């Protein structure tokens, strides 16, 4: 579909993340290294500004549910108005439509099995970080 895919890890001041931006970049790079046309980068600012600075014409967003669409539609319209950047929406596989990072972290924090929801190389990193954050409890 695209000659190059850029996964941009953005700093979101309103969200509390479990991993730092460099850690997230490293983990994404680890699981996408089999795809030679995928590049991982980071940005602190608006996604449309990143797109403009890197000559990216299309933002691809995954949609899980109607609630995602409501928010992402507003974002896509403002992104188009601000910088002329189009957004392509792709629906997620039905088997994953209920997933969120919060849900996966909660299940894992109670030693639940999340191996079907995250790439195998990242499972131990998630468990180790949750143990550190929760003091081993």
Would you name each region that the model predicts?
Residues 1-137:
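Nucleotidyltransferase catalytic core that binds NTPs
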């Amino acid at each position: 579909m695209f000659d190059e895919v850029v996964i941009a890890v953005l700093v979101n001041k309103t969200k509390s993340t479990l991993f730092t931006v460099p850690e997230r970049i490293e983990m994404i790079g680890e699981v996408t290294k089999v795809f030679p046309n995928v590049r991982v980068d980071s940005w602190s600012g608006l996604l449309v500004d990143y797109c403009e600075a890197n000559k990216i014409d299309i933002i691809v967003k995954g949609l899980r549910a109607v609630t995602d669409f409501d928010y992402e539609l507003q974002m896509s319209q403002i992104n188009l108005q601000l910088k002329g950047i189009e957004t392509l929406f792709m629906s997620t596989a039905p088997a994953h439509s209920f997933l969120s990072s919060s849900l996966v972290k909660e299940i894992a924090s109670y030693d639940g099995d999340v191996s079907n929801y995250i790439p195998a190389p990242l499972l131990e990193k998630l468990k180790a970080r949750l143990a550190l954050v929760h003091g081993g409890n």
